[in-house]
Swiss-Prot record:
One GO process term, biological-process aspect: regulation of pH
UniProt topology in membrane: Multi-pass membrane protein
Listed name of the protein: Na(+)/H(+) antiporter NhaA
Superkingdom of the source species: Bacteria
Gene that specifies this protein: nhaA
Keyword Ion transport tagged: yes
Main subcellular location: membrane
Compartments, record wording: Cell inner membrane
Catalytic activity: Na(+)(in) + 2 H(+)(out) = Na(+)(out) + 2 H(+)(in)
Role: Na(+)/H(+) antiporter that extrudes sodium in exchange for external protons.
Organism expressing this protein natively: Dechloromonas aromatica (strain RCB)
Secretion signal, residue range per the UniProt entry: none
Protein family membership: Belongs to the NhaA Na(+)/H(+) (TC 2.A.33) antiporter family.
UniProt-listed NCBIfam families: NhaA, PRK09560.1
Length: 389
């Protein structure tokens, strides 16, 4: 684990340093969006996001274009972790991988069980995801009171969670499908791989231009266009040397970090958390869909993460890092229930053109994420304080 932390020290510390501020900014944007949506300016606020620009609403541009940049950033993070980070050592990678599988499977099972055979069964993917910015933002509030390896574990877990969410989006949330456009997008991806692997083109420009074309073709194919961001990340040249500043992947990740944290995600929060809280909000939170979301995020996440982690360590498949205790793993599992932006993103795909279900789902996500963040903070604070006594 020491080697892993040494490898990650510079990049990871820079990444983690701004998560506290980013998390606070997301909270402020959410409060602002909720306040405006439930004021006299609410209709105008909703009308702004639904205004059509170049054939798509502003909300669609945010969710399809800006979030593709977010997924590009997530893909670059994942690539770094696979090459020289927490996931580069197979044995180190196994624990967050199995934890992520549990954190995806149990919440999905809870939602599916409550909604099977109904239209809201489409929301099974909603409680699968973890909001990296919010989860690490809450953990950052604890500062040095938690072990550094817990921050690394939660980062790897959240990245694997989002990878699972990306796969779910590609497989289950594709509406109309065009094989010609999809094959064309994959052909562009193949061409970018050739530029990287064979011709060793190190300039970012051809990759960014190819990525823009791939995004357009993905959009036309019916597969969600954000997938292009992840594919582009793995097509961009990466150096196996930790923190190699000449690496195109490293340079792009470094460039995107602050725009993603302080521009893209806050805009996404403003566009997607304008939840209208009506007089029937208590009833809406008691529907099978809302209960599945809340149950999946608040209870399913920590249960799945902790249970599968414990089983795999008990049978000798994985190893618990020396400075981590099971209370830390449970705490990370609770924080994994902060679905927020990622869960809202999947909600918009699951219930297209059904505003009432989308609004109720967002309310459930918001409540579950607040509960998970608060419980996770209190849990880790309590046990860390006891450990230090």
């Amino acid at each position: 684990m020491a080697d892993t932390q040494t490898k990650l020290s510079k990049t990871f510390s820079n990444f983690f340093a701004s998560e506290k501020t980013s998390g606070i900014l997301l909270i402020l944007c959410t409060i602002l969006s909720l306040s405006i949506a439930n004021s006299l300016a609410g209709p105008a606020y909703q009308g702004f996001w639904h205004a059509i620009v170049a054939g798509l609403s502003i909300e669609h541009w945010v969710n399809d274009a800006l979030m593709a940049v977010f997924f590009l950033f997530v893909g670059l993070e994942l690539e770094r972790e696979l090459y020289n980070g927490e996931l580069s050592n197979f044995r180190n990678a196994l624990l967050p991988i199995f934890a992520a599988i549990g954190g995806i499977g149990v919440p999905a099972l809870i939602h599916y069980t409550l909604n099977v055979g109904t239209p809201t069964q489409a929301g099974t993917g909603i409680p699968m995801a973890t909001d990296i910015a919010f989860a690490l933002g809450v953990l950052a509030l604890l500062g040095s009171r938690v072990p550094a390896s817990l921050k690394v574990f939660l980062t790897a877990l959240a990245v694997m969670d989002d990878l699972g969410a990306i796969i779910v989006i590609a497989m289950f949330y594709t509406q109309q499908f065009s094989l010609v456009y999809l094959l064309s997008a994959l052909a562009v991806f193949g061409l970018l791989l050739v530029l990287n692997r064979i011709f060793r083109v190190m300039s970012l420009l051809p990759y960014l231009l190819g990525g823009a074309l791939m995004w357009f073709l993905m959009l036309k194919s019916g597969v969600h266009a954000t997938i292009a961001g992840v594919l582009l990340a793995f097509a961009i040249p990466f150096s196996a040397k930790a923190d190699d500043e000449k690496s195109p992947s490293h340079r792009l990740e470094h460039f995107l970090h602050k725009p993603v944290a302080f521009i893209i995600l806050p805009i996404f929060a403003l566009a997607n958390t304008g939840i209208v809280i009506g007089s029937e909000w208590q009833h809406e939170l008691l529907t099978p869909n809302s209960l599945g979301i809340i149950g999946g995020l608040v209870f399913g996440k920590p249960l799945g993460i902790a249970l599968l982690s414990f089983v795999t360590v008990a049978i000798g498949v994985c190893r618990l890092p020396d400075d981590l205790k099971w209370t830390h793993i449970v705490g990370a599992g609770i924080l994994g229930g902060i679905g927020f932006t990622m869960s809202i993103f999947i909600t918009n795909l699951a219930f297209t053109n059904n505003a009432s279900i989308i609004n109720a789902s967002k309310m459930a996500i918001l409540m579950a994420s607040v509960a998970a963040g608060g419980l996770g903070f209190l849990w880790l604070s309590f046990f860390q304080q006891n450990d230090n006594q």
